[in-house]
Amino acid sequence: MVLAPGSCHRRALSSSQDAMVSVIPASQVSIALLEERYGLRETTQPDFFGEWTQGLEELTELEKQYLDRVKTHFKRLLKNPPLLENSVKMVVLSPLLDRAGFYDDPFHIQSEVSVDIAAEDEGQMIRGRIDVLVLKDRFWILVLEAKRSDFDVNVAMGQALAYMLANPESEQPTFAMVSNGQSFLFLKLTKTPQPQYANSRLFSLVNPGNDLYEVLKVMKRIGKMVVAEPQSD
């Protein structure tokens, strides 16, 4: 089987069990399929994904004030529909990437091929797109863009795990963040001794306070790990 997020995706998932190569569009990739074909398993071990709760640096007051403005801007957009499909990146994601330092050396953001998605809600077909960014081949950021800002982040979990499984790096864990601008979910995957993953809790701008504080902390934590840990040749 080959995963085809787009016509020119630079990696592919392959299965030696397949007599013939079959192409699976990324929009159709599910966690169940990855479990069946690649032995992927979800782990409930509390210490498997400690990066989203442990070793987090406190934010400065200026950073908190900045994130408060980001949340205010997003809530203002919600009150004045329709949302532009690229508003997620402009209002929420870009400020987070900036504050996490991902626009600066030694990070280098690469864009993957976008994936078209569709879901039915109360008889209406909702169409959207998943834009994929990758940092140093270790940290994937998937952004769901649609007319509705509450497009469930679970829609992109299968795609995120597929990108992580396709990474040729096998010794180091890989991470992903999935966001629709309103909700954020982090994932961690390791390949040895067998592929397994876990996710963080769901962070949401609907929650009291400002969950962007924790989101930025986790982004910084994972970013430092990606830079610090050596990559195999």
Model-assigned labels for residue ranges:
Residues 176:
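Short glycine-aspartate micro-motif
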Residues 2-4, 12:
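Acidic, Ala/Val/Gly-enriched low-complexity intrinsically disordered segments
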Residues 21-23, 27-173, 185-233:
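A short, conserved, highly charged catalytic patch centered on acidic carboxylates
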